[in-house]
Structures are given as C-alpha cells and as structure tokens.
C-alpha cells in the first residue's frame, strides 16, 4: 500500500504527533461519552486506591486510542508500557512484560486483535486473577506453577473489535467505542496543534482544514504540517482558507477529503460495476489493493459519510456518491452482482 497523506494509519511522518497529544482528560477534545465515562472510572479507582479496571478502546484508526491510553496512565499517576499484538509472538514475550509491571501500571497493547491464541491463553488468568501460569518441564513430568502479578490495568486498542475472541473481550470491564470527530471538534484540534507548533492559522483556515480531514485528528494534524509547508513557501506563512484550498488541490485532496485512492474505489464501483452491488474481493482485484486494507482503512469513512452502502450482496454506491462524481444514478433495482 502506498503512503497516503490522508491515511488514518500511522506513518513515519507522524513523529511530531506525540508532542501534540494532550496529557489530561480535560485537554482531550471530542469523544465526550467515552471521556465522561473514563473520568468517573478513573476518579473512583483513585479514591479506592485501586488499579483501574481493564479498558478496551475500539474504532477506526487515528481517532485517539493511543492518546487515551497515555492519558489514563497520566490521570492514574502510574507508568505505561506500550506494545502491540504482532510484537508479542510467544507466551514468553508476554510473560516478560507482565513480570516487569509495577502495581497499578498500565499495559497498552495496540492491535490487540492480532494476538495469537496461545498468547491470549496466558493473558486470561493475568487479567482475571493477576496470576501467570508457567509450565516447568516437558512431557509427563511437566508441572504448572502460578506466579502472582501486581494488579495492573490492561488497555487494549483495536480497529476490529469483531475479531476479538469472546473470552478476551469479556475480561474488559470498560469498553468504549471512539467515533469520527465533528468538523467543529477538528477545528479546535487544528487550532490547538497550530499553537503548539507555532503556526499562524486563521479561523476560516482551521475550519476548512477540519472539513477535509475525514473526521480524524491524525489526518488533521498531518494536513496541518503539509499546508504549513505550502504557506511558508508560496504564501506569507499564514494559513487561510484559500491557502488550505490551494495546497490541498496540489495534494489531490478534494472538498470532501477524498484522495486519489478514494476516487479510484468509488469510480470502480460506479463505472466498472454499474454502482454495485459488487463484492469486496472483486473491488480489491480491480484496483490492485488488499481486501483488508480497503475494509479497514478506506471503507469506514466512505460508509460513515454515506457514499457506500454495505449490503449482503456487496458494496453499493449511493446517490450522494453519484452526485459527488457528476454521474447519473441508475434507476432503482438496476445493478449487477459480481
């Protein structure tokens, strides 16, 4: 997959992102429901002098799951150890991490849905009983010993909650879904980030940038840095709505936040397959992209904003999609199955 300026996935260019992350819940913009619940749970745990219950954060990439995990640790006044599902390949890897935790520490596992079943089996007693089962020896003489662990908080993050096994999901006491951000929330985030990065941005520039950021703070911050470059070279260093529009045109990002890959997907459905329904595997083969990438990275935005309908027979382009691309929508009932 080629690198996209508006990809919600992390890129090497996002090294600046950590400096933009808030450190307290009161500074965290958006996600009011999740934030309000976490505030109650954190305050209650601190009053009792206990570790916070295990937390599962899920939703599309780039919405602030990692940021919230770090905020939880800061609010609890404890350390955080971060890793990801693909990195923990063997039970011994997880055991090494767990045995080095201090009481009430936060263990953050990104992409937790990618943990192997063998590693998950080790995690169950660790989450529920704060014990680690270690097998000594092999064969008939093998025996299991239980090692006590400090009470810790596991914060898991995933973009695909449906792939979590039921036993793992059931062990999380707090489950929060993160939603796409509103334009107003993103405008506030852009203004805050511009202040931290010492970038001059006008209110209309922040609003225009937010409108094209696909409801995702990571994309908004990345576009802010790209537009800053344009403003410094071709403008007076101040980001206005006009500067945003001109710079994003150069990046081939339209007024809806679509880039070339979004247009390729939508026009493939509309022009090649008559608007659908068309299967995801067929779309992937037609555009030369992986099925999972389309489903995880591209589709959430297109579905959320009403450009694609997901049906039992396949993906279907909506009336809004036809209007956006200047196409005439077919009469109801038309379309072929691929």
Swiss-Prot record:
Could you state a single Gene Ontology molecular function term?
ATP binding
Q: Which GO biological process entries does UniProt record here?
A: DNA recombination; DNA repair
Q: Where is this region: Large ATPase domain (RuvB-L)?
A: 1-181
Report the EC code(s) recorded for this entry: 3.6.4.-
Q: What is its main location?
A: cytoplasm
Region called Small ATPAse domain (RuvB-S), residue ranges: 182-252
Q: Where does Mg(2+) bind?
A: 66
Subcellular localization(s) per the UniProt record: Cytoplasm
Q: Which reaction does it catalyse?
A: ATP + H2O = ADP + phosphate + H(+)
Q: Which CDD domains match?
A: AAA
Give binding positions for DNA.
Answer: 291, 310, 315
Which residue stretches belong to region Head domain (RuvB-H)? 255-338
- Write the record's keywords in alphabetical order, separated by commas: ATP-binding, Cytoplasm, DNA damage, DNA recombination, DNA repair, DNA-binding, Hydrolase, Nucleotide-binding
| GO terms for cellular component | cytoplasm; Holliday junction resolvase complex
**Residues annotated as binding ATP:** 20-21, 62, 65-67, 128-130, 171, 181, 218
Function recorded in the entry: The RuvA-RuvB-RuvC complex processes Holliday junction (HJ) DNA during genetic recombination and DNA repair, while the RuvA-RuvB complex plays an important role in the rescue of blocked DNA replication forks via replication fork reversal (RFR). RuvA specifically binds to HJ cruciform DNA, conferring on it an open structure. The RuvB hexamer acts as an ATP-dependent pump, pulling dsDNA into and through the RuvAB complex. RuvB forms 2 homohexamers on either side of HJ DNA bound by 1 or 2 RuvA tetramers; 4 subunits per hexamer contact DNA at a time.
Instruction: Name the protein family.
Output: Belongs to the RuvB family.
| Quaternary structure and interacting proteins, as annotated | Homohexamer. Forms an RuvA(8)-RuvB(12)-Holliday junction (HJ) complex. HJ DNA is sandwiched between 2 RuvA tetramers; dsDNA enters through RuvA and exits via RuvB. An RuvB hexamer assembles on each DNA strand where it exits the tetramer. Each RuvB hexamer is contacted by two RuvA subunits (via domain III) on 2 adjacent RuvB subunits; this complex drives branch migration. In the full resolvosome a probable DNA-RuvA(4)-RuvB(12)-RuvC(2) complex forms which resolves the HJ.
Q: What is this protein identified as?
A: Holliday junction branch migration complex subunit RuvB
Source organism (scientific name): Geobacter sulfurreducens (strain ATCC 51573 / DSM 12127 / PCA)
């Amino acid at each position: 997959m080629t690198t996209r300026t508006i990809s919600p996935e992390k890129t090497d260019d996002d090294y600046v992102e950590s400096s933009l992350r808030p450190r307290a819940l009161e500074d965290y913009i958006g996600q009011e429901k999740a934030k309000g619940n976490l505030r109650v749970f954190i305050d209650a745990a601190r009053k009792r002098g206990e570790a916070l219950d295990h937390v599962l954060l899920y939703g599309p990439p780039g919405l602030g799951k990692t940021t919230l995990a770090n905020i939880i640790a800061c609010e609890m006044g404890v350390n955080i150890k971060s890793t990801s599902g693909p990195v923990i390949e063997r039970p011994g890897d997880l055991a090494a991490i767990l045995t080095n935790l201090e009481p009430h520490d936060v263990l953050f596992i990104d992409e937790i849905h990618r943990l192997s079943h063998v590693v998950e089996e080790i995690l169950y007693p660790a989450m529920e009983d704060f014990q680690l089962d270690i097998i000594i020896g092999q064969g008939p003489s093998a025996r299991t010993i239980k090692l006590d662990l400090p009470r810790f908080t596991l914060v898991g993050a995933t973009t695909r909650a449906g792939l979590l096994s039921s036993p793992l999901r059931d062990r999380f006491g707090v489950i929060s879904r993160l939603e796409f951000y509103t334009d107003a929330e993103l405008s506030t985030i852009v203004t805050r980030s511009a202040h931290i990065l010492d970038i001059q941005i006008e209110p209309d520039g922040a609003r225009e940038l937010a409108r094209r950021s696909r409801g995702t703070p990571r994309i908004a911050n990345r576009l802010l840095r790209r537009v800053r470059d344009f403003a410094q070279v071709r403008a007076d260093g101040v980001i206005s709505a006009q500067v945003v529009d001109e710079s994003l045109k150069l990046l081939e990002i339209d007024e809806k936040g679509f880039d070339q890959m979004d247009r390729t997907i939508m026009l493939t459905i509309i022009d090649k397959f008559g608007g659908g329904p068309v299967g995801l595997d067929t779309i992937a083969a037609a555009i030369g992209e992986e099925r999972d990438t389309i489903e995880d990275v591209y589709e959430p935005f297109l579905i959320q904003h009403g450009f694609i309908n997901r049906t039992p027979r396949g993906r279907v382009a909506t009336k809004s999609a036809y209007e956006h691309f200047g196409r005439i929508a077919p009469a109801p009932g038309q379309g072929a199955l691929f």
